[in-house]
Amino acid sequence: MAIKTDTNLSLFSSLDEDIICGVDEAGRGPLAGPVFAAAVILDPMRPIDGLCDSKKLSEVRRDALAIDIKAHALSWSIAQCSEQEIDSLNILQATMLAMRRAVEGLHIQPTLALIDGNRCPVMVVRAEAIIKGDDKVQAISAASILAKTARDHALGLLHIAYPHYAFDQHKGYPTALHLERLREHGVSPVHRKSYAPVRALLDNAVANEKR
């Protein structure tokens, strides 16, 4: 699934100049919920102040910047891979797929995708991986903010559907509280069953049934 919008392309200085999108993900480590990715093409004529790695920003600041990015970027797209896709493909491949979906969801086709990290998804667009790119490239910073805020919103909705797990507090990460609630309430439909703590609970449940 991809969510996208864009403004009109205000044009770069020459037809030969690369149209660059930044790409980043959010949610590889959690035990529950989808993994998200975002792609952003910034408008060089409409700079956005304060872009940096989303992890270094407060929730309030991230949310404010996400609004600015969506309003001022030339094009942006948010995509995800479900828990089922994560369990079927593994988290690395699911993350790569979410990134590719995000890039493909852009209304303006980039000529170069700058990817945060050390791996690039397989896609038609030329791509370059940049380690710690979310701190070095503003378009990647913007993508990290959109991916993070979209995932946090999704986990808020999961908290409404499954309040016993306190997703609003830990966002699905394997905190002591989350593990305690997992042991108490069992595995929900939105947990990643291929992840070790979740798989161990499922294996224990099967073993207990056989006794």
From Swiss-Prot:
It catalyses: Endonucleolytic cleavage to 5'-phosphomonoester. Its main location: cytoplasm. Coiled coil: none annotated. GO terms for biological process: DNA replication, removal of RNA primer; mismatch repair. Its EC number is 3.1.26.4. Residues 18-207 form the RNase H type-2 domain. It holds the Pfam family RNase_HII. One of its GO terms (molecular function) is RNA-DNA hybrid ribonuclease activity. The keyword Ligase does not apply. InterPro entries: RNase_HII (IPR022898), RNase_HII/HIII (IPR001352), RNase_HII/HIII_dom (IPR024567), RNaseH-like_sf (IPR012337), RNaseH_sf (IPR036397). It is found in: Cytoplasm. Manganese or magnesium. Binds 1 divalent metal ion per monomer in the absence of substrate. May bind a second metal ion after substrate binding. Keywords: Cytoplasm, Endonuclease, Hydrolase, Manganese, Metal-binding, Nuclease. It comes from the Bacteria. GO terms for cellular component: cytoplasm; ribonuclease H2 complex. Endonuclease that specifically degrades the RNA of RNA-DNA hybrids. PANTHER family: RIBONUCLEASE H2 SUBUNIT A, RIBONUCLEASE HII. NCBIfam families: PRK00015.1-3, PRK00015.1-4. This is Ribonuclease HII. It comes from Herminiimonas arsenicoxydans.
